[in-house]
Curated annotation (Swiss-Prot):
Keyword Transcription regulation: no
Sample GO molecular function, one term: ferrochelatase activity
CDD domains: Ferrochelatase_C, Ferrochelatase_N
Lineage: Bacteria, Bacillati, Bacillota, Bacilli, Lactobacillales
Record flagged with keyword tRNA processing: no
Gene Ontology BP, a term: heme biosynthetic process
Organism of derivation: Enterococcus faecalis (strain ATCC 700802 / V583)
Record's function text: Involved in coproporphyrin-dependent heme b biosynthesis. Catalyzes the insertion of ferrous iron into coproporphyrin III to form Fe-coproporphyrin III.
Family note: Belongs to the ferrochelatase family.
Alphabetized Gene3D superfamilies for the sequence: 3.40.50.1400
Entry protein name: Coproporphyrin III ferrochelatase
Amino acid sequence: MKRTGILLVNLGTPKDSSKTEVRKYLKTFLSDRRVIKIHPIIWKPILNGIILNIRPKKSAKLYQKICTENGFPLLEYTEKQMENLKNICPEVEVTIGMSYSEPSIETALDTLLSKEIEELNVIPMYPQYSGTTVGSVFDSVMNYFIKSDRIVDIKFIRSFYNNPQYIDYFSKKINEALNESPIDAIVFSYHGIPMSYVKDGDNYPKECTKTTKLIMDKLGDIRYYQTYQSKFGPSEWLKPATDDTLKKLPSKGIKNILIVAPGFVVDCLETIEELEHENRNYFLENGGEVYKYVHPFNGDIEFAKLVKDIISL
């Protein structure tokens, strides 16, 4: 049997919630050509001259709000899933890598290759494919091996938006919440991307829609909405927007909702601050009454079992 390695990849977090560290993180993130497709000659002056002089202060305050004694949830839960995988797959080398912070993907691959692995399984922790996330991870992994004298067998998981265990997990979590109290509708909120990326061929929204449909097929006849959050910049993004939708629902008689974000494997700034707090306030301030958020896997070992199933260990 080949000596196998698993690399779990997530977005990353600032080193801490200081303005300086948040600025470093944002600069790395917003310099990725997969994330921002504007030509560097145009984009760099905007990034360095405007965005990085304004956004870090605001973002630092938000990161301070979500930071716990264990650090930032995204890193905490990603590390927990690494430990879960090590426990259920003791014969496999497992590590994590972050696209825009430490431990970097390069550092993670150095670690795995030092263990003399022969087969590498790369799992971007994004259920739905997008060039802005999974595509960027692919670039980083391939760029690493372009410079390496040693190549191993590589299995790259493009997406798992329709994996039965993944669909079952969210369906069960939603059902548990529905059994606690009646609701008027379910709101599925996915991270948005620019419409221009979709027109260029990114099929992310198709996979989001398929995920929603597969979950709803298990839930039955319940009203639901699919929305997109976290818009950045002036360009057109996927619609409808989560915040706009939540502001309007109470006027339509929908005052008790369940909100779920299947595009997120672990809680992070976008779910904790945007969905649990900011968007909750929008909904309640506009006449909403009950707002319940369904958490993703976080530290639940079911995600590690899902990964094991995906790579057929």
